[in-house]
Amino acid sequence: MTSIDWRSALTDDEQGSIRDIVAAATRHDGVAPVGDQVLRELPADRTRHLVAVDPDAGAVVGYLNLAPASDTAPPMAELVVHPDFRRRGTGAAMARAGLAEGGTHARIWAHGNLEAARATARTLGLQVVRELLQMRRPLTDLPPVTVADGVRLATYSGPGDDPELLRVNNSAFAWHPEQGGWTDADIAERRAEAWFDPAGLFMAFDDASGKLLGFHWTKVHGPDLGEVYVVGVDPAAQGRGLGATLTLTGLHHLAERLSNSPQPTVMLYVEADNGAAVKTYRRLGFDVSSVDAAYAAVAD
């Protein structure tokens, strides 16, 4: 019988096994079962770790990460079970344990909201409380970039840019469960990632004051896929077309980076209920590719 136990920290071997399970699930399902932040948490002790071990196989077969509540987000769980060990009730048992540990307001992500996740949600009596759209478009036939008078575009020059980057990010995303409330450590963690490229972090400055108005952080996933990782505009600078300017600047950069691909594509994530942003991205040629759903127990 599969054993399921909480850990305050993971061994190096457990971390390696979990990364292998995530990779296997991604290949099998066509969608990553957990977000990048979960992988960053594996060596840390900021979150709780629920590990499923199959005694016959003598191996880790499932993992749930439980992030505690923050000022902007409820407790959030993310879950993966190895494809070879599914349909045994492990996923449902781990989801039940994670939500119970997280408390009344805890949620659990279903990346791609696949049928297996929907079935588990029905079994546990969960309902969708939040949806995140993944939108994509080809990196071809891009509109030209237009920069307003008084605005200067530059790329990230190093940690000296961080105070302004944090100011704009936390103003633009004060409401956001994951993107809001960033600190120096959040930027430093991403700067340490293998994918980080300072030439792909675009910043728009006000010529007169020198203040940062907005930024676009791009990410390259592989030879065929790039991402609009974060676009943030200072609320005080809204209405100047900066969102479109920064987005298109990043798209042209990604198109150049992926120029050897026969089908270069860019993706982004946006809240399903952010109608204005969804409309903007549709105007830029993006269409919905998949939907991530956050589930929770909802009182009658």
Swiss-Prot record:
The keyword Transferase applies. Acetyl-CoA 2 binds at residues 231-233, 274-279. Pfam families: Acetyltransf_1. Disulfide bonds: none annotated. Its EC number is 2.3.1.189. GO terms for molecular function: mycothiol synthase activity; protein-N-terminal-alanine acetyltransferase activity. InterPro entries: Acyl_CoA_acyltransferase (IPR016181), GNAT_dom (IPR000182), MshD_Acetyltransferase (IPR050276), Mycothiol_AcTrfase (IPR017813). It catalyses: 1D-myo-inositol 2-(L-cysteinylamino)-2-deoxy-alpha-D-glucopyranoside + acetyl-CoA = mycothiol + CoA + H(+). Keywords: Acyltransferase, Repeat, Transferase. 1D-myo-inositol 2-(L-cysteinylamino)-2-deoxy-alpha-D-glucopyranoside binds at residues 36, 178, 219, 227, 269. PROSITE patterns: GNAT (PS51186). GO terms for biological process: mycothiol biosynthetic process. Catalyzes the transfer of acetyl from acetyl-CoA to desacetylmycothiol (Cys-GlcN-Ins) to form mycothiol. This is Mycothiol acetyltransferase.
